[in-house]
Amino acid sequence: MSGYMVGNDDKSDAMLNFTKAYQNNDIGSVKSIFSENVIFHINDTDLTFDEVNEGFSAGHNFFDNIKHSDADVSTMYYNDGQIFTNYWYTWSAVSKKTNNKITLKGYCWFKWENDKVVEVYNAFDPTAYIAEMAN
């Protein structure tokens, strides 16, 4: 499979807008980029948009200053018509309970069909995140 990759297109911008909305606890504001039946794979869990919106928003109850840094985004346009936007990032936040700052690396992709995101994959090691929430 081959194709081409770009970093300054509408789909890469949509990924960045989604991640900014997450950081601002406003994922609902970008719902229009997703298909009605979008499925999110968060590590090994499959979720709907509404479940992701609720779950990601709940993280703001435990952490302040949620940020993405070291972000790298690009969209792959494959010759077979598939389109994926890839996003590598460093997630950081400060625990509201312990005031500890935690940092973790993550990777996400959007799969596009008809200019809508139909599938999302997001992978990260949740160990430190879960430990801070349990404190």
Language model regions located:
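Short, surface-exposed coil-to-beta transition loops
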Residues: 86, 101-107
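Low-complexity, intrinsically disordered terminal/linker segments enriched in charged
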Residues: 119-135
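Short, low-complexity N-terminal intrinsically disordered segments enriched in polar/charged residues
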Residues: 1-24
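Short, solvent-exposed coil/turn segments at beta-strand boundaries
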Residues: 82, 110-117
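Surface-exposed, charged secondary-structure patches
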Residues: 57-98
